[in-house]
Amino acid sequence: MNKARNLRFLVDFMKAAGVSTNQVAQLMGVSRQAVHHWFVKDDMKVSQIQRLFELCGYRIVFALEKEAAADTLPVRVTMSVVNPAGPQRLAFLKNALDRYDVSRESLAARLNVGKTTLYNWFKSDDCFLSYVYAIAMAEDMKLDIRIAPL
């Protein structure tokens, strides 16, 4: 569990909160082996991460940001249409792609996945966290993870 890179924030949270792997399994309604598998693979779905933090009484927010360029305007107006009643887990990803003019076709090529894969992520409103890290690296973005009590 100490070798985690993608889930390092989760390992640190569990240590700080005093939450064991057994407790995570009980909260999530899965076996200890499933939790162990997440840490061995160093990956889990965004929906699973958000659900776990909600069950622990915390809110986790992901954001993808690029470093501000010197030639950009200091004011940024972002119009984002997100259905508040609908799924919003990957809204941060959609907003970042729109804000930085990243086409889904070019992103699919950089990640070496099909366009259908990206379509399925947004249709199901879920993807593995390792892909979020891969997108951040491919598009020279920083993944910001904020955790706060509910």
What are these regions, as identified by a protein language model?
Residues 29-44, 112-127:
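Recognition helix of helix-turn-helix/homeodomain-like DNA-binding domains
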Residues 1-3, 42-43, 50-85:
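N-terminal flexible/basic segments that precede or flank functional cores
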Residues 1-17, 72-101, 146:
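A short, Lys/Arg-rich alpha-helix, primarily the initiator
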Residues 89-105, 114, 120-125:
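Conserved, charge-rich beta-strand/loop surface module that forms ligand/interface-binding patches
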Residues 47-63, 129-145:
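DNA major-groove recognition helix of helix-turn-helix/homeodomain DNA-binding modules
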Residues 21, 104, 132:
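Helix-turn-helix DNA-binding elements, focusing on the entry/boundary residues of the two helices
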Residues 23-25, 106-108:
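Short alpha-helical "recognition helix" segments of helix-turn-helix
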